[in-house]
Amino acid sequence: MSESYNHIFVSLRPMTAEMYHAYYKEYQNDPDLYIDKSKYTPFVYSPEWVNNYIQRQISRNRKCFAIMLRDEMAGEIIIKNIVPGKSAALGICMKNAHYKDRGIGTQAERLAINYVFNELDIPLLYADSILTNTRSQHVLEKVGFRLLREEGDFKYYSIERSP
């Protein structure tokens, strides 16, 4: 799965254990995304943490993809809560600030939506965003998600496949 727009070439590749370790060695969590800033602590790479994370993804029957900017891993997209033929949910995380505000996440979300609708044959996709993540909310709305509701610290979205 790939897409090129404004000379930015983005593709999605299934995540491998090696890719996860490479990703998290360079990962930086964003303090601006914490509602309670006192709970923020910088991410510190740990091989054990990454191995446990991989096992959680496998045990939850998720489809995990690396967001590739040419040959660089820019982030991760996860298709989760999969109910075959009915619905799934989308999650996205960029590796660090270098990959934000460049259209990479937008292209990756478009590719993921296409994959869910056409490859998995799932007609309904959900996503959510914490209230403070206005960047994510903008991208979700830009690619066609519609706001369902605001509840607690989150906004909930959905997009349906066209008939």
Model-identified regions with their sequence ranges:
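Short secondary-structure capping micro-motifs at structural edges
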Residues: 52-55, 78
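Acyl-donor (CoA/ACP) binding surface of acyl/acetyltransferases
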Residues: 1-22, 26-33, 64-163
